[in-house]
Amino acid sequence: MNLSFYGAARSVTGSRHMLEVPGFSVLLDCGLFQGRRDEAFRRNRDLGFDPKSIGAVLLSHAHIDHAGALPVLPRYGFSGKVYVTRASADLTTIMLEDSARVQESDCRYVNNKERRGGRASVHPVYDSNDVGKIARRFEGVRYGDTLKIAPRLTASFHDAGHILGSASIRIKYTAKGNTTTVLFSGDLGRANMPILRDPEPPPPCDILILESTYGDRLHEQFGEEMTKKAQDLLEHARLYKSKIIVPAFAVGRTQELIMRIKELVGEGRVDPIPIYIDSPLALKATEVFRRHRECFDEETLKTFSSDDDPFASRYIHFISSPEESKRLNTMKGPMVIISSSGMCEGGRVVHHLKHAIQDEANVIVFVGFQAEHTLGRKLVEGWDVVPIFGVPMKRQAQIVKFNGLSAHADRHDLLAYVRAIHPPPSSVFIVHGEEKQALSLAATIQAEHPGMEISVPHMGSTYDV
């Protein structure tokens, strides 16, 4: 059995890991690289392997850094199935459709500017036709079911508690009377977060592929201090008639923000101000949430059973058309605009940043991880001048970060996950974390488990397991 790592190796984007057994290859995730345009352009077309050689894909969840390159596969001969939870199948389809539209739109915008500079045109990685081809290969599965994906090879999906439908995936391979079990954590969530159930305890395994997004840090808890911080932000917008721009994932983070704002209003801590969810994808994703209540925790289920939609209110407005989106840029505050993409690498939020970033009364609020080289990372790091659509712009808006909203397990959670596996795995591969985070987590696990073989793969590396 071989394990190869073609993405999210000492980085957090482009999750792609391949498990090879005699006569069959399984791809774990097929994510889109995000970051420097030229590098992303190359890596999203050259996947590092031959898609024709892939027998099946096992998809952990719908986020673009895990699922975003799936439509590239059928272009180059992939003809197998994509196994995915039913909620993730619905979410992934709409996210890939949105990704194709955003790529096409952004390429048109950039090409108009590049043409004037005499530079070559850029093209989308895939189009909506490619999305349709891969979506027809999705096979929805339920949590806990064991499915046979090839002779002597089975897989089961376990609730990871990260986003709706997210899963850790356990793979069993039996040969010559011996069974080897591989557990791919996917992205792990946190306990006691809104909407979703807590992550399931890990099942036993011989080999663990573990994410490390926050492998060297701990999250704040969304307690009274952070609630007061959110309350103050909304009051700031009211006082200065300003805009709060929130780049947020359309799936998971947007729905959580809606619920938390509703809680503040419902408790009488703030008066409502207009909240604009400027993302057609978020609107579609929220409908998927409503359809897949099997993923909800008890509290959210009770809210639905009381005939109260946790994702709706009179002051919450979902924006669909480009015309409505553009109108927001000419409107006066106070208002909150929640828009994707979460790392500011495309989508409507970039246009809102362009119009809001040079007003010191406005606030840009980050509520999730920002990968290296993204516009979001530059803003979080405090760059005074940032490139927006290729044009340097001076930042005067305030930058605020909420760490307590992360849907990712932190260092404590990840270490607890490893400790919960009985008996301990013989090998652990640390992925989906920037090098500093991955190496820090690896060193701590090694110190706690001296007999365990810990690896932090480089891009393109292969291991005989």
Report each predicted region and the residues it spans.
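Short active-site oxyanion
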Residues: 55-56, 78-81, 243, 272-274, ...
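Hard-cation-handling environments
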Residues: 231-372, 387
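Metallo-beta-lactamase
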Residues: 99-163, 293-332
